[in-house]
A protein has these predicted regions:
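Single conserved hydrophobic/aromatic residue that forms the stacking wall/gate
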Residues: 188-196
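A short beta-strand-turn-helix
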Residues: 27-29
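Polytopic alpha-helical membrane-helix bundles and their juxtamembrane interface segments
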Residues: 5-8
Length: 196
């Protein structure tokens, strides 16, 4: 999980450990249902046990890919928005990639735990904070969307504490951890009924 990549091979962000890139429809959060081109990078030092992309954790499994190739593929489809995700994409210098994509007039979205310093240019930041490696303060003021994964009741309080730190315009989402989603939804529904 906590594998480091060889930063010398990344050429200052002109190469990145690309897991996959593809055109799709967004399935979570504020932009659900909108088309986007996803760029998924390898490497994650957060290691959520319920992660649906554990295959991305070890960046050494993904040879550094020249960003010009990624930009070429992203601009060859109809996408107007690019989602950079992982793993944890902020492990890498994203300035060269985001600058190249912005040069084509594309909107750049970032999905991050916020636990590393920001690099790059983003039109939308989806912050998904994790208890085991909390976000840096700058992540809260950069966030346009806060998405907290809820696995148990205590996560609702964690979500509230994080929501208090983001800006007033930030969109707030609770995302049930899928293996316990029915239990979480029943818990939330029961609590809401008690408040009426």
């Amino acid at each position: 999980m906590k594998e480091a990549t060889n930063y010398d091979l990344l050429d200052g962000g002109r190469k990145l450990p690309l897991v996959e890139d593809f055109y799709t429809i967004q399935g979570e959060g504020f932009h659900t249902g909108k088309p986007a081109y996803f760029i998924r990078l390898g490497g994650c030092d957060v290691g959520c046990r319920w992660c649906d992309a554990k295959y991305t954790w070890n960046p050494k499994l993904y040879p550094p890919t020249d960003i010009s190739e990624v930009v070429r593929r992203a601009t060859s489809c109809q996408a107007q928005a690019i989602v950079i995700t992982g793993g944890e994409p902020l492990l890498y210098p994203l300035g060269p990639l985001t600058s190249a994509l912005k040069g084509h007039g594309l909107k750049i979205f970032l999905e991050t735990s916020g636990s590393h310093p920001f690099s790059g240019y983003f039109d939308w930041v989806c912050l998904s904070p994790k208890r085991q490696q909390p976000p840096l303060p700058e992540a809260f003021w950069r966030a346009h969307e806060l998405k907290v994964i809820v696995e148990r009741e205590a996560d609702l309080q964690w979500a509230e504490r994080n929501a208090e730190q983001v800006g007033r315009e930030c969109k707030l989402f609770l995302q049930p951890e899928w293996s316990v989603s029915e239990e979480i939804c029943l818990l939330y529904t029961s609590d809401a009924a008690d408040d009426m």
